[in-house]
Amino acid sequence: YLLSGSLSDGSVVIYTDENVKVRLILNGVSINSSSSAAIYVKSADKVFITLAPDTENVLSNGGTYETVNDNNIDSAIFSKSDLTLNGSGSLKVTAKEGHGVVSKDDLVITGGTYNIEAASQGLSGKDSIRILDGDFTVTAGKDALHAENEDDKEKGFVYIAGGTFALASSGDGISASGDMTLLDGTYTITAGGGSENGEDHQEERPGGSGGPGEPGGMLPSGERPQGEPGEKLQEESETTDEGEASETASTKGIKTNGSLAISGGTYTIYAADDGFHSNSDIAISG
């Protein structure tokens, strides 16, 4: 299907058999939906969105989302099936609420120029995010790139073979619940406003030695930090004035709950928390 022209308030909905592959070619299109996704994939095997050469395409949401048949549609592009973005044109995605692009299966991007502004996640794939190439500028109220599958630890992974990434996020720059593999690419990531917004903390050093000027791991107040040695204070929660615990957003540059493998690329990271973080192993080569 070849799409061009403007739609001021409406959606393109794909609803077909689950064994059917669908291709949309965006040939200079502008679609805004005041209450749903500009493009909504309700049912299909795989959907390919191709950015035609030398075209500028715009997809946006006006700031609200209405639940349709118990489906929580919460992004400017929302797919319940595998979604692939490709082509050499450009795509601007604006989500005043919710996410920029969401796939509830695999999100694959092989090329194109993307400018994404989202109140929540910029790019989100439940089973995986796989990027071969592309030029990405993402501003996100949560994570810029986010892959998470709570049901299957083998999924929720991120694989990036190349591309140029300028990511600014209030949460993590790139986050995965599974493993993460970065083969190449140029990354400029600002997470949580940068290191100047990081919390000052003192860690207990191995052998009981603290930081400079604070023997034995003592805090400037004279108190010892809580928790096990090496554990960062206030990692996951903080206490409000009312005494109730509230979740603290993770503000790491690159974070994975699985293994992190980096074999190439150029990285410039400004993060309020860790630049690189893995809850498993980190392997760097190349």
Locations of the language-model features?
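A composition-driven surface/loop motif
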Residues: 1-286
